[in-house]
Amino acid sequence: MEIILQDTVANLGKLGDKVVVKSGYARNFLFPQQKAVPANKANLEAFETRRVELEAKQAANLAAAEKRGAALAALEAVVIASKAGDVGKLFGSIGTRDIATAITAAGVPVVKSEVRLPEGALRNTGLFEIAVVVHSEVSTIVKIEVVQAE
């Protein structure tokens, strides 16, 4: 199915690109989230009239994401206290929800879907560098310090 992207989609294309995707991906994901429209003559003309508006909206979203990214980069190490054994192994683990809550409490709002833990949940005490992706083009590293709770 040929579509016109109305927003930048990771690994697919940028605003205004005409791409071919599987019809299920278009119907079930891209169309409901208004990230794309079917590529027909009427939609192509409608898109061209709205192009400036969509580009301005995308630029505003990117500027807001860069501002949040700068605020996240300016954070000192965020401390999370958790129960742990004598050798520093946690009783349980610290996942994306716990990290997002701690960063939000530190003053910068973050949702758990923006936190990336490629190696899985944190299971030990120590200092960790966590990637936070606030926009498809903006990502930053936040230092998380896991300490033993008293």
Curated annotation (Swiss-Prot):
Family of this protein: Belongs to the bacterial ribosomal protein bL9 family.
Keyword set includes Disulfide bond: no
Entry GO CC: ribonucleoprotein complex; ribosome
Functional description taken from the UniProt entry: Binds to the 23S rRNA.
Gene Ontology MF terms in the entry: rRNA binding; structural constituent of ribosome
Protein's name according to its UniProt entry: Large ribosomal subunit protein bL9
Keywords, sorted A to Z: Ribonucleoprotein, Ribosomal protein, RNA-binding, rRNA-binding
GO biological process, one term: translation
Keyword Ribosomal protein: yes
HAMAP family in alphabetical order: Ribosomal_bL9 (MF_00503)
PANTHER family, per database record: 50S RIBOSOMAL PROTEIN L9
Pfam families: Ribosomal_L9_C, Ribosomal_L9_N
